[in-house]
């Protein structure tokens, strides 16, 4: 209790603090572009940026420039999350949070589904082709076609697109990716 002295007045401000332990565990992961339909990852520079992690229709995390995400605190239980990327084919991930933090590791994703349908077709190619051969700063450069983020839309990026060209994604499974 604070008391007044030497002509000063004192005011008591009641405060509360919740010092109970956290009720959940962090869940982390990294989203990378798939290199092919076999499920091979394209590599560490092919990160999927600004990919939302959605649980129960709520965005709980978003990937950063390194493709990494952190869901800060989930209580123990089973979860189904959707990786939702504006130019990719959505992926569902199921995981169980137990009594410690959980790292989901590297998760592959198809990143060249520009029109968000279940096909990698001429509509997607038109988006890629419009940016092909360009570099950052040029009017026709599209950063979403620069899959490895090196500032150029070139053969490295085309190899990734062409691996999925013509794919009917409605029958594609992320099971082993």
Give the label of every model feature segment.
Residues 1-2, 83:
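Hydrophobic/tyrosine-rich beta-strand signature of extracellular beta-sandwich/beta-rich modules
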Residues 7-22:
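Extracellular fibronectin type III
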Residues 23-46, 51-54, 59-177:
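Cellulosome-associated attachment modules in secreted, modular CAZymes
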Residues 4-6, 134:
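Extracellular acidic, Ser/Thr/Pro-rich low-complexity tracts
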């Amino acid at each position: 209790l604070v008391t007044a002295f030497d002509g000063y007045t004192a005011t008591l401000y009641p405060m509360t603090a919740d010092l109970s332990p956290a009720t959940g565990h962090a869940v982390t992961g990294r989203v990378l572009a798939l290199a092919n339909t076999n499920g091979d990852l394209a590599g560490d520079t092919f990160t999927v940026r600004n990919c939302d992690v959605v649980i129960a229709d709520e965005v709980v995390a978003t990937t950063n420039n390194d493709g990494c995400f952190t869901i800060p605190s989930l209580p123990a239980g089973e979860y189904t999350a959707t990786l939702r990327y504006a130019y990719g084919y959505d992926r569902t991930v199921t995981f169980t949070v137990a009594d410690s933090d959980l790292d989901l590791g590297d998760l592959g994703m198809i990143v060249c589904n520009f029109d968000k349908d279940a096909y990698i077709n001429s509509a997607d190619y038109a988006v890629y082709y419009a940016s092909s051969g360009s570099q950052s700063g040029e009017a026709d450069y599209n950063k979403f076609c620069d899959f490895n983020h090196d500032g150029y839309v070139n053969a490295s990026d085309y190899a990734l697109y062409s691996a999925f060209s013509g794919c009917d994604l409605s029958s594609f499974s992320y099971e082993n990716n």
